[in-house]
Amino acid sequence: ADTGEGEFLAEGGGVR
C-alpha cells in the first residue's frame, strides 16, 4: 500500500 514504490494504486504512497 504505502510503500512508496508501485503500490500507489492502493492508497497513494507510491509515486512510481
UniProtKB/Swiss-Prot annotation:
GO terms for cellular component: extracellular region. It is found in: Secreted. Transmembrane segments: none annotated. Keywords: Adaptive immunity, Blood coagulation, Coiled coil, Disulfide bond, Hemostasis, Immunity, Innate immunity, Secreted. The keyword Chloroplast does not apply. One of its GO terms (biological process) is blood coagulation. Disulfide bonds: none annotated. Conversion of fibrinogen to fibrin is triggered by thrombin, which cleaves fibrinopeptides A and B from alpha and beta chains, and thus exposes the N-terminal polymerization sites responsible for the formation of the soft clot. The soft clot is converted into the hard clot by factor XIIIA which catalyzes the epsilon-(gamma-glutamyl)lysine cross-linking between gamma chains (stronger) and between alpha chains (weaker) of different monomers. Forms F13A-mediated cross-links between a glutamine and the epsilon-amino group of a lysine residue, forming fibronectin-fibrinogen heteropolymers. Cleaved by the protease thrombin to yield monomers which, together with fibrinogen beta (FGB) and fibrinogen gamma (FGG), polymerize to form an insoluble fibrin matrix. Fibrin has a major function in hemostasis as one of the primary components of blood clots. In addition, functions during the early stages of wound repair to stabilize the lesion and guide cell migration during re-epithelialization. Was originally thought to be essential for platelet aggregation, based on in vitro studies using anticoagulated blood. A long coiled coil structure formed by 3 polypeptide chains connects the central nodule to the C-terminal domains (distal nodules). The long C-terminal ends of the alpha chains fold back, contributing a fourth strand to the coiled coil structure. Heterohexamer; disulfide linked. Contains 2 sets of 3 non-identical chains (alpha, beta and gamma). The 2 heterotrimers are in head to head conformation with the N-termini in a small central domain. This is Fibrinogen alpha chain. It comes from Hylobates lar (Lar gibbon).
